[in-house]
Amino acid sequence: MTSPNNYLAKIKVVGVGGGGVNAVNRMIEEGLKGVEFIAVNTDSQALMFSDADVKLDIGREATRGLGAGANPEVGRASAEDHKNEIEETIKGADMVFVTAGEGGGTGTGAAPVVAGIAKKMGALTIGVVTKPFEFEGRRRTRQAEEGIAALKEVCDTLIVIPNDRLLELGDANLSIMEAFRAADEVLHNGVQGITNLITIPGVINVDFADVRSVMSEAGSALMGVGSARGDNRVVSATEQAINSPLLEATMDGATGVLLSFAGGSDLGLMEVNAAASMVRERSDEDVNLIFGTIIDDNLGDEVRVTVIATGFDAARASAAENRRAGISAAPAAEPVQQQVPTTNATLPPEKESIFGGAREENDPYLSRSAGARHRIEETRSGGGLFTTGNDRDYRRDERREDHRDERRDERRDDRSYDRRDDRRDDRRDDRGDDLDVPSFLQ
């Protein structure tokens, strides 16, 4: 007869680097059951203090067990050198959690290698990582972003917890150790919320296939945790979870949601239904909503809710595509046909000039400038805020034409002056001849 254990999903949690191993230790201290813990590090000393089921020192050759020195390339190379050992430790897993603190050397560089191996071996691979605090520096933040991008390529689902959001959970006296401990607790709650759904039978049961349907190839995910007591406790805890400061964005439009309720035996179905309906309203209309309940009388009247929302990448890409399609499908606005005045057209006389007197703008130059303004406004109506090349060409031609007109007017004036001078000279000559003739005759 086949043992029922053969049909239980095998879940392994791999902590990579200092932050990942600390998170694993925290989960072990909290008594997380039903999973196998694996610690992977380049720091031999840190591994000595871990209670993980399997400890894998990948820095024996590259770093002599002294750590990666905050260099992700060292962490990546160390993991590559021990691929066979990593494969051996992950073998047989149905689901693998890879936890790490991004920004350092081993976690940033080795976590994508570990996740890639797990994914290649057919395990549902979930990354749960933290982003560094701002006070840890720009270099660490930049390395973290690069590591997160690499993890996203190889994980089915990636949950990123920004440490800076943890500051919103504490008061002004929150210590550094308390902040990092809070980060480990968030990682623990996320992993526990998922594993408990699979490993602990509940009133509303969820199996591994349900979890896979939501988290396989899901891309980025958001995770929120809430707890409450007293009246309306389930709805209150759910509101805390979906409005958690740990979420970098809202869960609106999620196409996949895992919803876990944990409480005592008095946990009511109606209040669970009300909370699940609230989550469904925030999600995509075709959301794949998987929710389950876990009965734990040790919680007393407390209710804990874990929400993991996935499918944002596809939903947002589809929304962006729809917006682009809507823009491209919209008919182009026809340009307004405006009557462009000719150079001989005149504008209506203005009643008052800037000097208080009447003024008529019947000068061709002013009329031509008005026409230019009409043409430029018409061009800009189709070209946005920036001046187009046609505007510049027109103004250049306009200046040339104005210059030619001015030169033509000057020459015309010169010729008129010359003709008047010639007439004066002729009159002088005529008068001179009248005077000179008699004297000559004399």
UniProtKB/Swiss-Prot annotation:
A single MF term (Gene Ontology): GTPase activity
Compartment list: Cytoplasm
Gene Ontology terms: biological process: division septum assembly; FtsZ-dependent cytokinesis; protein polymerization
Keyword set includes Metal-binding: no
Pfam families xrefs: FtsZ_C (PF12327), Tubulin (PF00091)
Region (Disordered): 329-442
UniProtKB keywords: Cell cycle, Cell division, Cytoplasm, GTP-binding, Nucleotide-binding, Septation
Record carries keyword Hydrolase: no
Disulfide bonds: none
InterPro entries: Cell_div_FtsZ, Cell_div_FtsZ_CS, FtsZ/CetZ, FtsZ_C, Tub_FtsZ_C, Tubulin/FtsZ-like_C, Tubulin/FtsZ_2-layer-sand-dom, Tubulin/FtsZ_GTPase_sf
Coiled coil spans: none
Any single Gene Ontology cellular-component annotation: cytoplasm
Oligomeric and partner information: Homodimer. Polymerizes to form a dynamic ring structure in a strictly GTP-dependent manner. Interacts directly with several other division proteins.
NCBIfam families tied to this protein: ftsZ
Family: Belongs to the FtsZ family.
Protein name: Cell division protein FtsZ
Originating species: Corynebacterium glutamicum (strain ATCC 13032 / DSM 20300 / JCM 1318 / BCRC 11384 / CCUG 27702 / LMG 3730 / NBRC 12168 / NCIMB 10025 / NRRL B-2784 / 534)
